[in-house]
């Protein structure tokens, strides 16, 4: 492992429509095979559908959905004397957002709706109401961390 310098976090350009870095990151996570314009159109269409259903603005609705999926703790495997323990650790804010976005995209891809924009809109709507696959994933992670609270002293 090189020891020269610490590589900083790359600055992401905000998205063109709402000038939000969070939304730009979400578009990048949704993107497949470098098709960014397709990813942008899917996200913007999904946000339009979401705004029609709720009384919130585009970014407020997206932020509300993301807030309900963000994990606060997760477990990491730690080997201590021949046995592996699942040690609960706090999640850093950047990783919190990344995990939430990844879970929402994965849950949307697994849905059976017609278009990806509709699937994404439905998943975001479910996340706003604290239901759906992405929220369930977050709750499962929290439950696992809670169950392994006894091993918290193995933190590093």
Swiss-Prot record:
Ordered alphabetically, the record's keywords are: Ribonucleoprotein, Ribosomal protein, RNA-binding, rRNA-binding, tRNA-binding
What does the record list as GO biological process? translation
Report disulfide bridges, numbered on this chain: none
Cellular compartments per GO CC: small ribosomal subunit
State the source organism's domain of life: Bacteria
* Gene Ontology molecular function: rRNA binding; structural constituent of ribosome; tRNA binding
SUPFAM superfamilies, sorted: Ribosomal protein S7 (SSF47973)
Q: Which HAMAP family match?
A: Ribosomal_uS7_B (MF_00480_B)
Q: Which family does it belong to?
A: Belongs to the universal ribosomal protein uS7 family.
Could you tell me what this protein does?
Answer: One of the primary rRNA binding proteins, it binds directly to 16S rRNA where it nucleates assembly of the head domain of the 30S subunit. Is located at the subunit interface close to the decoding center, probably blocks exit of the E-site tRNA.
Oligomeric state and interaction partners are given as:
Part of the 30S ribosomal subunit. Contacts proteins S9 and S11.
Instruction: Please report the name of this protein according to its UniProt entry.
Output: Small ribosomal subunit protein uS7
